[in-house]
Structure formats: structure tokens, C-alpha cells
Amino acid sequence: MRFFSYLGLLLAGLTSLQGFSTDNLLEEELRYWCQYVKNCRFCWTCQDGLCKNKVLKDMSSVQEHSYPMEHCMIHRQCKYIRDGPIFQVECTMQTSDATHLINA
């Protein structure tokens, strides 16, 4: 029975990780990534065909389909730590592990 409670905790942790989306990055992560990969779609907010960079405020607006915006994904390296009956997840952001998915 104890095995199933551990399994439930582990699955709950995995479920919370699946909820991560680059559409809603934390502000400090958004600042970091958008300094280096300015063409990632998550760095831009678009309305009525005009897009403004969320981080680089001095950058001028661009037309939505005239700037090469790509769908990007950020990958993290995670490890699971068991502390008695509780599992914790620790993730580190890897700077060199941003994958661009062109035309996704």
C-alpha cells in the first residue's frame, strides 16, 4: 500500500511539471531568454497585427507576419529527491538547451 502512495506523489509531481508552458514564463525567465533569443514567440505580445517585445521595451513594434517569430521550447534538467515519504522535484534551467521549432 505504501508503494501506491509514493507512486501517487510522484505522479502528482509529474502532472504539475506537465502544466509548464512557455506561453506564461516567469518574469525573470522571460527577461533572461528574450535577451538571447529575441525571435521566440513567447517574447512577443501581438494585437491587431502589431507585435511588441515583452522585454525589450525600446524595440519598435513589428508587423506580426513580417518578423521571423518561432515557437520555442525550454528544456530543464530535473531530479527527484526522496525525503522520507515526500518526493521533491528540483529543476535547473540550462542556458544552451533552447530548442527552436520552426513552423510548429
From Swiss-Prot:
Belongs to the asfivirus MGF 110 family. This is Protein MGF 110-2L. It comes from the Viruses. InterPro entries: ASFV_fam_110 (IPR004848). Keywords: Early protein, Signal. The keyword Transcription regulation does not apply. Transmembrane segments: none annotated. Plays a role in virus cell tropism, and may be required for efficient virus replication in macrophages. Residues 1-31 form the signal peptide. Induction: Expressed in the early phase of the viral replicative cycle. It holds the Pfam family v110.
